[in-house]
Swiss-Prot record:
Gene Ontology cellular component annotations, sorted alphabetically: cytosol
Gene3D superfamilies hit by this protein: HUPs (3.40.50.620), Isoleucyl-tRNA Synthetase, Domain 1 (1.10.730.10), Valyl-tRNA synthetase, C-terminal domain (1.10.287.380), Valyl/Leucyl/Isoleucyl-tRNA synthetase, editing domain (3.90.740.10)
Source species: Xanthomonas oryzae pv. oryzae (strain KACC10331 / KXO85)
Protein name (Swiss-Prot/TrEMBL): Valine--tRNA ligase
Family designation: Belongs to the class-I aminoacyl-tRNA synthetase family. ValS type 1 subfamily.
Length: 980
């Protein structure tokens, strides 16, 4: 007797099975067979699993399990990232919540870092526990943390090598600066948000008595104004930065300003003279065609400043207040700038000193003001001077830090950079030569665009948590780079009497992440490389990641791996879309639409779900709105679906598009799919009690041959879909075979044989049921590992299989069963299915009870179908509850019947005795009258021009859809009435 539970309850076995798998070491690389390696994009160590993680990890796990079952030596390299900024914020927030008065600054660097390690120890394995719950089949003994000793050594080695090769340098450049965190951040950490702002137009007086003829025209080209002006009008969205202007620019071909190419203007509020320059960057059609240039506070202006050798005036402190130049640059009130030197002839040192000197021209009343307070004062003083021409509303793209929400400042600081030109050229060659394949291939265009427009990479961050930059400075400011201080002293002959201090900055996390493909394999330590299989597992087989980090991570891994190892990091890059909610909105805490994958797996009450979505909001005022929306969408919370239902849902949604809408209803449907598989297995087990088989079935019935042929085809489709990373088509193929072919049809078609006195047919059918079910479980296992393992353990003893786990059982192959002679059987069973479907449809339309036997009459122009009907008569009678099957001769009168057509056959079901003819006619006539009335209402509305023209388009479309539905219903009712 089967010991399989009577109902599908994933909570009763999923955690148990995972613990068994891990304890048995099934996920450890085998060291035999062809290597297959997958890299996990390392999530933040203090983070939790979100839908994006679950989506990509499900696909990775399916690939790993599939290849493990095919005999590959699989390594799924997992681990976590130290996530500098995110982790510092989490720990700082927790210090505040503890209420002990401890802060980052009060603890100091060493004390704070100790707190971070404490936090990592307490909560750092949360995400790994969650990954286990999802079914991640990785060797956890190889899990790597980017701050572990081995990866940290790799970071130092990479920095030193690139520095010695001249690829890493320290310089003053413009970076994205978060004035709250007081650190540079990457482009990926900046969100451009459309906001309402203003565009201010300001008069900049021309210097040296210069004037020009200003002419304006209307839309038809007619002159509307001509006057002599001694000023230029400049429009800006950031008037406070005018204090740092070092030029204004016009287009070289703009006829309005041809006479001003050598002019200067007097910068309002400061009295400084700055040049008018010409540059093709200017859009002549925007505003007045005159643009202020502030190289130290705008990325585009910075590029202009580089082209024209303009000085850079840094206005702000690290927390976005106006600097006090006498404190910032105490030695740089330099007299050389008054000696008549042309700014275009300055070298870099002179240019820097000039920028610092010009900061002394900032009016005293601005020093120490916050940037927005400075803006107010600038506007007030411009208005007092009557040179604020216009203020008008303007839509702005405001750069905000994704963690603090603060406006990011383009900020001039000394940072460490990597020269990217040569690295990018090589990285592009590796992809375009085909050594690395992108899937879908259109993402190569995105990769190419980024690589061809690359800029030097700012790798330093003003944080404490992270890999500290291996550079030491002496008191004279000389920089020395090495693996440690001892090496620096030995290499440069620096005695103990020379004081050295290490750079306080750390490397941004992408620097260590770019080394992930080979630092996890022991590089650069030769012994560790041998132990961890560097030569065997690099390059990895595939990287599964999102399109949003193609440049920030994928490209950098390609460049770094080639630079340090001479190899590519991976063969394939499978780019997934981004998970959004069912309405296509980005999932975010602030919108209150985040779905926790573990809540889908294990379920959550509505109260707990509301608490999870409303606690810790950056905008607490949104809590009420989020709670209301959550209670409306999930009035009873979220039911438990189990990991397999979530995984299958993810696979089914994994199209090759940019955005993927996650619909929880799909998960409910795939939970039903798992339940269907469970019940089908119970049927098979109950009907094969005591049976023992080995080898491949020798089918005796057409139904067996049909299902074996279908199994061979779905096996071929499965391999093809894995090869092409089409998880959506994979899920569709397996679903169709499991639900329709096996559960709905073969289980039904097997019943006549199982209940037949032909013992050979019954035995072969039992064998085929077990064989196909076992093969199906293996086909499904990479996507739904838990339910397939639980069912497989019940099935395989009856097939003589002794392998301990389905995860190590050989994956089905095309040709496991020779189906070359099964074409006729396939055609016959497809015909049988059509017959059964047609007759069941008739019974349903006539509301004939399932247990009621009916008579079937058949008509055909030829006798060709008679032998096939005779062969399948017993199956038809069993499946359709047929009293008898009779043939009508040509011209023979037919009784009142319901009819259906299958090929050349007409199927007739006599109505006498099945329905009350008079009552059924009355019912249908009444229903037809009602539907006609509804159609009349729709036609009345749609025939009313006022309604069609004035009603919202969506309302009109709904009315048209209703008309189509009613019309379809009427046709069906009339057809039924005609049969009576």
């Amino acid at each position: 007797m089967t010991t399989l539970a009577s109902s599908y309850d994933p909570s009763s076995f999923e955690s148990r099975l995972y613990a068994q798998w891990e304890a048995a070491g099934y996920f450890v690389p085998s060291d035999t067979g062809e290597p297959y390696t997958v890299l996990l994009p390392p999530p933040n160590v203090t983070g939790t699993l979100h839908m994006g993680h679950a989506f990509q990890q499900t696909l990775m796990d399916a690939l790993v399990r599939y290849h493990r079952m095919r005999g590959y030596d699989t390594l799924w390299q997992v681990g976590t990232d130290h996530a500098g900024i995110a982790t510092e914020m989490v720990v700082s927030r927790n210090l505040a919540l503890e209420g002990k008065g401890e802060t980052r600054d009060s603890l100091g660097r060493e004390g704070f870092i100790a707190k971070v390690w404490e936090w990592k120890a307490a909560s750092g394995d949360t995400i790994e526990r969650q990954m286990r719950r999802l079914g991640t089949s990785s060797d956890w003994s190889r899990s790597t943390f980017t701050m572990d000793p081995q990866p940290s050594a790799a970071v130092n080695e990479a920095f030193v090598r690139w520095y010695e090769q001249g690829l890493i340098y320290r310089g003053q450049r413009l970076v994205n600066w978060d004035p709250v965190l007081k650190t540079a951040i990457s482009d990926l950490e900046v969100e451009n948000v459309e906001e309402d702002g203003f565009l201010w137009s300001i008069r900049y007086p021309l210097a040296d008595g210069v004037t020009y003829e200003h002419i304006e025209h209307d839309a038809d080209g007619n002159e509307t104004l001509r006057e002599t002006r001694d000023y230029l009008v400049v429009a800006t969205t950031r008037p406070e930065t005018m204090l740092g202007d070092t030029a204004v620019m016009v287009h070289p071909e703009d006829a309005r300003y041809l006479t001003l190419h050598t002019a200067r203007i007097v910068l309002p509020l400061t009295g400084r003279h700055v040049p008018v320059i010409t540059d093709d960057y200017v859009d002549r059609a925007f505003g007045t065609g005159v643009v202020k240039v502030t190289p130290a506070h705008d990325f585009n202006d910075y590029q202009v400043g580089e082209r024209h050798n303009l000085p850079l005036v840094n206005l702000f402190t690290a927390d976005a207040k106006i600097i006090d130049p006498r404190k910032q640059y105490p030695d740089d009130e330099s007299p050389f700038v008054n000696a008549g030197i042309d700014w275009r002839e300055l070298d870099q040192i002179q240019r820097k000193r000039l920028g610092q000197h010009l900061a002394y021209k900032i009016p005293a009343q601005y020093i120490g003001l916050d940037r927005y307070d400075a803006r107010k004062l600038v506007l007030s003083e411009l208005e007092d001077l009557s040179i604020l021409v216009e203020t008008k509303p303007h839509k702005l793209q405001v750069p905000r830090g994704d963690r603090t929400g603060q406006v990011i400042e383009p900020y001039l600081t000394d940072q460490w950079f990597v020269k990217m030109d040569a690295l990018a050229k090589r990285g592009l060659e590796l992809v375009e030569s085909g050594q690395i394949q992108f899937v879908p291939p259109n993402w190569i265009n995105t990769y190419r665009h980024w690589m061809e427009n690359i800029q030097d990479w700012c790798i330093s961050r003003q944080l404490w948590w992270g890999h500290r930059i291996p550079a030491w400075f002496d008191d004279a400011g000389h920089c020395h780079v090495g693996h440690d201080e001892a090496e620096v002293r030995a290499k440069h002959g620096l005695g103990a009497e020379i004081a050295l201090h290490q750079d306080s900055d750390v490397l941004e996390t992408w620097f260590s992440s770019q080394l992930w493909p080979f630092s996890t394999l022991g590089w650069p330590d030769s012994q560790a490389m041998a132990e961890r299989g560097f030569a065997r597992y690099l390059p990895s087989s595939v990287l599964v990641t999102g399109f949003d980090i193609i440049f920030f991570w994928v490209a950098r891994m390609i460049m770094a791996t080639d630079s340090f190892t001479g190899q590519v990091p991976f063969r394939d890059v499978y780019i997934t879309g981004l998970i959004r909610d069912a309405q296509g909105q980005k999932m975010s805490k602030s919108k209150g639409n985040v779905l926790d994958p573990l809540d889908i797996i294990d379920g959550i009450s509505i109260e707990d779900l509301v608490a999870k979505r409303t606690n810790g909001l950056m905008q607490p005022r949104m809590a009420e709105k989020i709670e209301k929306a959550t209670r409306k969408e999930f009035p009873d919370g979220i039911i438990a679906h189990g990991a397999d239902a979530l995984r299958f849902t993810i696979a089914a949604l994994a199209t090759h598009g940019r955005d993927i809408k996650f619909d929880l209803g799909r998960a409910e449907g795939y939970k039903n799919f798992c339940n269907k598989l469970w019940n089908a297995t119970r049927f098979v087990l109950m009907n094969t009690e005591g049976a023992r088989f080995t080898g491949v079935p020798q089918p005796r019935t057409e139904a067996e041959k049909w299902i074996l042929a279908r199994l061979d085809k779905v096996t071929a489709e499965t391999h093809a879909h894995y090869a092409n990373y089409r998880f959506d088509l994979l899920a569709q193929s397996l679903y169709e075979f499991a639900w329709n072919a096996f559960c709905d049809w073969f289980v039904e078609l097997a019943k006549p044989a199982l209940n037949n006195q032909d013992t050979d047919a019954a035995a072969s059918t039992r064998h085929t049921l077990l064989y196909v079910l076992e093969s199906l479980l293996r086909l499904l296992h990479p996507l739904t590992p838990f339910v397939t393992e639980e069912l497989w353990q019940q099935v395989v003893p009856r097939l003589g299989i002794t392998t301990a786990t389905i995860s190590l059982q050989r994956f089905p192959q095309v040709g496991d069963v020779d189906t070359s002679g099964y074409a006729t059987a396939e055609a016959d069973v497809e015909w049988l299915k059509s017959m059964v479907s047609a007759l069941r449809r008739v019974r349903s339309e006539l509301n004939v009870p399932p247990s009621k036997q009916v008579r079937l009459l058949l008509q055909a122009d030829t006798a060709d179908e008679r032998p096939r009907v005779a062969r399948f008569a017993s199956q038809l009678s069993f499946l359709l509850k047929l009293e008898r099957i009779d043939w009508l001769d040509a011209g023979q009168d037919t009784p009142p019947s319901a009819a259906a057509i299958v090929g050349e056959l007409t199927l007739l079901v006599p109505l006498e005795g099945l329905v009350d003819m008079d009552a059924e006619r009355m019912r249908l006539d009444k229903e037809i009258k009602r539907v006609k009335g509804e159609i009349g209402k729709c036609n009345g509305k749609l025939g009313n021009a006022t309604f069609v023209q004035n009603a919202p388009a969506v309302v009109v479309d709904q009315e048209r859809a209703r008309l189509a539905d009613w019309t379809t219903q009427l046709a069906g009712l009339r057809e039924q009435r005609g049969k009576l």
